[in-house]
Regions:
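Active-site residues of response regulator receiver
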Residues: 39
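Two-component/phosphorelay signaling modules centered on CheY-like receiver
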Residues: 1-16, 30
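Receiver (REC) domain active-site loop signature in two-component systems and cognate sites
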Residues: 42
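As written
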Residues: 33, 47, 79-84
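Helix N-cap/capping motif at the beta->alpha junctions
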Residues: 17-26, 47
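Two-component signal transduction core modules
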Residues: 36, 63, 78, 86-87
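Interdomain helical linkers/hinges and coiled-coil/dimerization scaffolds
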Residues: 79, 85-135
């Protein structure tokens, strides 16, 4: 269903689907992803446990949890783990689109900031080297 919605809204994501939490963790151990969209209730490993392992591997990973659990303790645990969004089912398609657009914007901002920091560091390094060589 989520793949369908991502495709419907023409979001610029390459989607990899996992059949359960362990499968998803296997994918995460093999390659880097920018966003993890997961359900809480899954076989073998729930979404909170998956989020914990995923964020240990990639602290910058954006995790969006979708849950049918209205018990606030699940949301509290997700917040403690560093999950960026926690959505309750049933999900409205536009709500998912808005959240994913927001997450995508924050990823773009982070990438831009990293490039800017790198350019600033290179400029300072070159400037200092030039200054040192001119004496």
């Amino acid at each position: 269903m989520y793949c369908f919605l991502i495709s419907k809204f023409k979001l610029p994501f390459e989607v990899t689907s996992a059949i359960n939490g362990e499968d998803a963790l296997g994918y995460l151990q093999q390659e880097h992803f920018d966003i993890l969209l997961t359900d809480i209730q899954m076989p073998f490993m729930d979404g909170l446990e998956l989020s914990k392992h995923a964020l240990a591997l990639y602290p910058d990973l954006r995790v969006v949890i979708i849950s049918a659990h209205e018990d606030f303790s699940y949301a509290q645990t997700a917040i403690r783990l560093g999950v960026c969004e926690y959505l309750l089912k049933p999900i409205q398609p536009q709500e998912l689109n808005n959240i994913l657009q927001k997450v995508l914007s924050s990823i773009k901002e982070q990438h831009l900031q990293k490039r800017l920091d790198s350019m600033t560091a290179n400029y300072a390094k070159n400037h200092l080297l030039t200054s040192a060589n001119s004496r």
